[in-house]
């Protein structure tokens, strides 16, 4: 009975996975490798499989491959940023909250093989489980198809959303805007808090970003830091839209 259930789950996974790869425009050779990438330890335990057949080793590899891929992207995209800033930006992209966003864009959690108990307790929507599966998939893709395929995947699933509104708080817009200013030799950037309002337990802060003694944009947030990020985001987007600052 258990073996039949396992066969059904694996067959269902293979069909869904094949369809998913087609939709992403990606090729694969070793489907067993990807099955391992999506096998949570609870699935392995339920069917008394070898404990090394779960996805944790591939997750370990995928984390390193993601760091390399994102490092190259940031290195090429931000030629004026020093190492410290690049490291900070990479850390905010290759982290659980952002990986969950990327995974959810393509509904990767639908592929995860879970044990009965883990499924019942909501494991399929658990952020840590989703981000782990995302990293494991990248590790499997690297082993099966190489770094070029990982880059192709990242171009479709990661890079387009790095500066998306949904990732505000993940992307450091203050750093992005500072880089633009540096590349244009436009002088120093400063931030000024111009308003605080609301009760103590629900404050709203408004900050403006100042470039060459001129306020160029403002933003609001629940903290001073968030309001500065919002102001920098507005200034950065004005720059991207080629409007004068």
UniProtKB/Swiss-Prot annotation:
Location of the RNase III domain: 17-146
Highest rank taxon of the organism: Bacteria
Any one Pfam family match given in the protein's UniProt record, by short name: Ribonucleas_3_3
Coiled-coil positions: none
Cofactor: Mg(2+)
Enzymatic reactions: Endonucleolytic cleavage to 5'-phosphomonoester
Enzyme Commission number(s) from the entry: 3.1.26.3
Family: Belongs to the ribonuclease III family.
Name of the protein in question: Ribonuclease 3
């Amino acid at each position: 009975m258990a073996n039949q259930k396992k066969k059904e789950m694996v067959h269902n996974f293979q069909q869904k996975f094949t369809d998913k790869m087609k939709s992403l425009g990606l090729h694969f050779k070793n489907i067993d490798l990807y099955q391992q990438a999506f096998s949570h330890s609870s699935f392995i335990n339920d069917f008394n499989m070898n404990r090394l057949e779960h996805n944790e080793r591939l997750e370990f590899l995928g984390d390193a491959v993601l760091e390399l891929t994102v490092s190259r992207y940031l290195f090429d995209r931000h030629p004026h940023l020093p190492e410290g800033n690049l490291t900070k930006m990479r850390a905010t992209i290759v982290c659980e909250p952002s990986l969950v966003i990327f995974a959810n864009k393509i509904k990767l959690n639908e592929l995860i093989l879970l044990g009965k108990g883990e499924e019942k307790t909501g494991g399929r929507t658990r952020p840590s489980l989703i981000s782990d599966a995302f990293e494991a998939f990248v590790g499997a893709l690297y082993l099966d198809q190489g770094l070029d395929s990982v880059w192709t995947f990242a171009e479709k699933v990661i890079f387009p959303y790095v500066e998306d509104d949904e990732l505000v708080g993940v992307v450091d817009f203050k750093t992005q805007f500072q880089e633009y200013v540096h590349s244009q030799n436009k002088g120093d950037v400063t931030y000024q808090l111009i308003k605080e309002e609301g009760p103590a337990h629900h404050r709203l802060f408004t900050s403006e970003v100042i470039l060459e003694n001129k306020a160029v944009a403002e933003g609001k947030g629940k903290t001073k830091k968030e309001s500065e990020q919002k102001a920098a985001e507005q200034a950065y987007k004005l720059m991207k839209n080629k409007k004068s600052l």
